[in-house]
């Protein structure tokens, strides 16, 4: 401080934690079980990862599905498609089957999912209002030559 140091902080929130919608997960698990057998379906439940899908799950019913067929570290330089049939074809069949399940019977399953518990934010405007509130910059320490001020 004696040399006139200042500390300026810029705080920007990262991605939100992913929260897979429970109702959508139940429908997807049922569809996947019919497609590949229930013994091949894992419901990982809640995870600690934060991702752009986490942001979406704040305002929309969301589900981040992982389908086998690759090996290596996700997003790593050793990530490779090792089973194109499972990775590409089974994945596409799963997505289409899930859409069909949600839309059949006048979209009964989709309506049930949409009637689930409240989301973290009622709409995207409320979400962005919070993000803007967290996104800020300020001088944490300011020294005017005689005194230092610390702001929290």
Map each language-model feature to its residues:
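Metal-dependent amide/peptide-bond hydrolase catalytic core
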Residues: 1-152
């Amino acid at each position: 401080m004696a040399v006139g140091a200042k500390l300026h902080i810029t705080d920007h929130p990262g991605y939100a934690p992913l929260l897979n919608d429970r109702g959508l997960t139940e429908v997807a698990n049922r569809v996947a079980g019919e497609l590949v057998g229930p013994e091949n379906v894992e419901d990982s439940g809640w995870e600690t990862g934060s991702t752009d899908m986490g942001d979406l799950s704040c305002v929309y019913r969301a589900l981040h599905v992982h389908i086998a067929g690759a090996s290596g570290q996700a997003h790593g330089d050793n990530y490779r498609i090792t089973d194109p049939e499972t990775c590409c074809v089974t994945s596409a069949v799963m997505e289409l089957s899930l859409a069909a399940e949600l839309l059949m019977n006048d979209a009964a399953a989709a309506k049930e999912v949409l009637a689930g518990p409240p989301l973290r934010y009622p709409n995207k405007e409320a979400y962005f209002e919070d993000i803007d509130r967290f996104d800020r910059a300020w001088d944490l320490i300011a020294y005017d030559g005689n005194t230092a001020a610390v702001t929290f």
